[in-house]
From Swiss-Prot:
One of its GO terms (molecular function) is magnesium ion binding. One of its GO terms (biological process) is 'de novo' IMP biosynthetic process. Transmembrane segments: none annotated. It comes from Thermoplasma acidophilum (strain ATCC 25905 / DSM 1728 / JCM 9062 / NBRC 15155 / AMRC-C165). Keywords: ATP-binding, Cytoplasm, Ligase, Magnesium, Metal-binding, Nucleotide-binding, Purine biosynthesis. Mg(2+) 2 binds at D131, D288. The gene is purL. It holds the Pfam family AIRS_C. Belongs to the FGAMS family. Mg(2+) 1 binds at E107, N558. Part of the phosphoribosylformylglycinamidine synthase complex involved in the purines biosynthetic pathway. Catalyzes the ATP-dependent conversion of formylglycinamide ribonucleotide (FGAR) and glutamine to yield formylglycinamidine ribonucleotide (FGAM) and glutamate. The FGAM synthase complex is composed of three subunits. PurQ produces an ammonia molecule by converting glutamine to glutamate. PurL transfers the ammonia molecule to FGAR to form FGAM in an ATP-dependent manner. This is Phosphoribosylformylglycinamidine synthase subunit PurL. Monomer. Part of the FGAM synthase complex composed of 1 PurL, 1 PurQ and 2 PurS subunits. HAMAP family: PurL_2.
Length: 759
């Protein structure tokens, strides 16, 4: 059957809802009424391909209908003079050195990873690479931030085991990224039972492109030819964006069919082919076929240019010969790219596709009118006003802001801190990530200067950020970091999001870079619930306030709503990917202690608050007053570190696990111990000083002969000398009394093997 007519003009409310449910449209009653009114004006009922096209374009995933208003309100003006493209195309573009630009994007692939962890995570990597590639850029680095369930829990009815999801997600990222030859260099991993049903897979990518070879995702001229290159089109991923725009139910056959199937063996030559065609100047515009498939890609590209399109589906290479027109139109099969070119360049691109053994089809042309017309087997299956398709409803949903707690709860002190810190450093959210991250290739392109792990052989520790040298003939580098603080955002969405951004900022400073740009992936529950919408609004407001204060552009983003199962929402999780610049990668700093007899300093005013910390959560406390970071102080820290860069041997930010975790991780990278006295940090209890995670703290290692020069000119910045490096033990005193004394290797063993039994 070529097409069916869907009778909606005479449908009452009940029938409209039934049509939406039966066809998997995920459109509300009001939206179905708007579709009915449109076709009433046309004097006909829609063809199946037309109503499916509307559902794709109007899905939460594609349209941002619940978030667009607030994103524009708080983030719309965040550009700088070095911003090239922000919030306009498939990825953000930022100047790198005047001649080259870097391209960056982060996307979520949450619902697919809940249903098919391996495939969902793999296609998340493939899709984000194509978002960067379609701007004409060579992908140079992958980033992934993962938020997974309690891996010790049993299978839930209708859901997959969190441990199974863990293994599948890591395996999908590993296999896709390693096979396409792009290093996976940065990210984060967080566990909580609230992610049991809704794991979050936030994938990011950074690329490099010559400024005169940047490709836009908008059409240029009527008469230009539209071509499709890459893999074949199949039934995999049909209704993927609709599925991603609703709450999760049980894992079923239909939900599995909404998952795309990735093939890195096609993606890798497609990267080569696209870059070859772009280097030859053959591509006028380009868009990845991601969520919504050809329907979204073609409509969005010509709409952005102010045009329309006429498209024929017959020559598209199919995985299954009996596919209907609407299935071809909305298929989300992976590894496909839509390109616009001059008519005289079609054969040149075809030859490049054949060289790399890729499928190639001429599918249509750009038209001057603002309509989209699609033909299949000599029948017109779509004839619609493109503005109606692409101008989805925009909702200003009501929201309620959580009342800020005034109290501060301090858990009881452990009787034996030596025993406690062994258990603490082995916890899921404080232990080493070696088992996961070592499955990824960090150095495949030969451009990774600082890898995710740094230190002496067999004594490695975590880096704060990684450094990539994207150009062969330049020492200029990109500093990359990504993560979120859902434990803090859950307590106070505004302050918690500021702390997320502050941590990313400190990670880049700690590595020797200067923060340069931001992208986000905002993961929340059901926006139809006022408290969830309130979390989102406060989080976006915090991103705007932070970036405006610190002079950073927000150049791209992604919103993932409806992350709930049976009215249980995820923790609000705004993931921040921040990119910094470093003028000379040879001046990068790392986190491990470099030698014995060096001084240890803490800079930044202590927070003296355990709210949201791993220490508090370990004791069952999840609420309380959460102070926002002092951004004026953070600015002073930035300037101070820049002026003292040559004196700093190593540095590490104070964040997850607090001051004790920061000091210990610095020690683990070399096996060198330390002896500190924390009595001058503040007047708070020892556990508060050791395990507080808020504030702007960084720990620095300074050579003894540079100390006087280092502390000179601090301009009121809080700088506390804690002690010295040396020996093979971790020793912490309070006012001259010893409170912790453990062997470095003993504590490292607990930290290093915390994940062993789960993956």
């Amino acid at each position: 059957m070529i097409f069916r007519t869907i009778r909606i003009r005479d449908a009452d409310d009940a029938r409209l809802k039934a049509i939406s449910k039966r066809l998997g449209l995920a459109l509300s009653l009001d939206e179905m009424k708007a579709v009915r009114s449109y076709f009433e004006r046309l004097g006909r009922d829609p063809i199946d391909a037309e109503i499916h096209a509307v559902a794709q374009s109007w899905s939460e995933h594609c349209s941002y209908k619940s978030s667009k208003y607030y994103l524009k309100k708080y983030l719309g003006s965040l550009k700088t003079d070095y911003t090239i493209l922000a919030m306009e195309d498939d990825a953000g573009v930022v100047d790198f050195d005047g001649e080259y630009a870097y391209v960056l994007k982060m996307e979520s692939h949450n619902h697919p990873s809940a249903v098919e962890p391996y495939g969902g995570a793999a296609t998340g990597i493939g899709g984000i690479v194509r978002d960067v590639l379609c701007m004409g850029a060579q992908p140079v680095a992958l980033i992934d931030s993962l938020f997974l369930g309690d891996v010790s829990s049993d299978r839930y009815e209708g859901l997959l085991s969190p441990r199974y999801i863990f293994g599948g997600v890591v395996g999908g990222i590993r296999d896709y990224g390693n096979r396409i030859g792009i290093p996976n260099v940065a990210g984060s991993l967080y566990f909580d039972k609230l992610y049991n049903s809704n794991p979050l897979v936030n994938a990011g990518c950074v690329g490099i492109v010559r400024r005169d070879r940047i490709v836009r995702s908008k059409s240029y001229k009527p008469g230009d030819v539209l071509v499709l290159m890459g893999g074949k089109t199949g039934r995999d991923g049909i209704h993927g964006v609709n599925f991603a725009s609703t709450t999760l139910g049980k894992v079923t056959k239909s939900s599995r069919l909404a998952i795309q199937l990735g093939n890195p063996i096609v993606e890798q030559p497609m990267i080569k082919a696209v870059l070859e065609a772009n280097d030859a100047g053959l591509i006028r515009a380009m868009k990845d076929l991601g969520g919504g498939g050809l329907s979204s890609a073609a409509t969005e590209m010509v709409y952005a240019g102010g045009f329309g399109a006429e498209i024929t589906l017959d020559d598209i290479k199919l995985k299954e010969s009996n596919m209907s027109g609407w299935e071809i139109w909305i298929s989300e099969s992976q590894e496909r790219m839509l390109m616009e070119c001059y008519p005289e360049d079609v054969e040149k691109i075809r030859q490049i596709a054949e060289k790399w053994n890729l499928d190639f089809s001429v599918i249509g042309q750009v038209t001057a009118d603002r309509r989209i017309r699609v033909y299949y087997k000599k029948r017109k299956i779509i004839d619609m006003d493109i503005e109606f398709l692409d101008d989805s409803p925009v909702y200003q949903r009501p929201y309620r802001i959580k009342e800020v707690e005034k109290s501060v709860t301090v858990p009881q002190e452990p009787e034996d801190l030596n025993s406690f810190v062994r258990d603490f450093m082995a916890r899921l959210n404080t232990c080493a990530r070696f088992n996961v991250v070592r499955q990824y290739d960090h150095t495949v392109r030969g451009s990774t200067i600082v890898t995710p792990f740094v230190g002496r052989p067999n004594k490695e520790t975590h880096a704060d950020a990684t450094v990539i040298k994207p150009l062969e003939n330049s020492m200029r580098g990109l500093v990359l970091t990504s993560g979120s603080r859902p434990n803090m955002v859950s307590v106070d969405p505004y302050a918690g999001t500021l702390l997320t951004l502050a941590e990313a900022y400190k990670n880049i400073l700690s590595t020797g870079g200067r923060p340069h740009s931001v992208v986000d992936a905002l993961n929340f529950g059901n926006p139809e619930r006022e408290e969830i919408m309130g979390q989102f609004v406060e989080s976006v407001r915090a991103i705007g306030d932070f970036c405006r204060k610190m002079g950073l552009p927000v150049v791209a983003g992604n919103v993932s709503f409806y992350n709930e199962y049976r009215k249980t929402d995820i923790m609000p999780t705004p993931t921040i990917m921040m990119v910094g610049l470093i003028d000379d990668v040879r001046r990068s700093r790392t986190t491990y202690m470099k030698g014995s007899g060096n001084a240890i300093y803490l800079i930044g005013e202590p927070c003296d608050n355990l709210t949201g910390s791993e220490y508090s959560r370990m004791h069952g406390y999840t609420d309380g007053f959460l102070p926002a970071p002092d951004l004026d102080e953070l600015t002073r820290i930035r300037d101070f570190l820049s002026s003292k860069a040559d004196m700093i041997l190593s540095s590490h930010d104070v964040s997850s696990g607090g001051l004790f975790a920061a000091l210990s991780e610095m020690s683990f990278g070399s096996g060198i111990g330390f002896h500190v006295d924390i009595s001058n940090v503040s007047a708070a209890r020892p556990t508060v000083k050791l395990f507080s995670e808020c504030g702007n703290g960084l720990v620095l290692e300074i050579a003894k002969d540079k100390e006087e020069q280092f502390v000179d000119g601090s301009n009121g910045l809080a700088i506390k000398r804690l002690g010295e490096t040396g020996g093979d033990r971790i020793i912490v005193d309070e006012a001259g009394l010893n409170i912790i004394d453990v062997a470095v290797d003993d504590l490292r063993g607990a930290w290093e093997h915390g994940l062993d039994r789960y993956i």
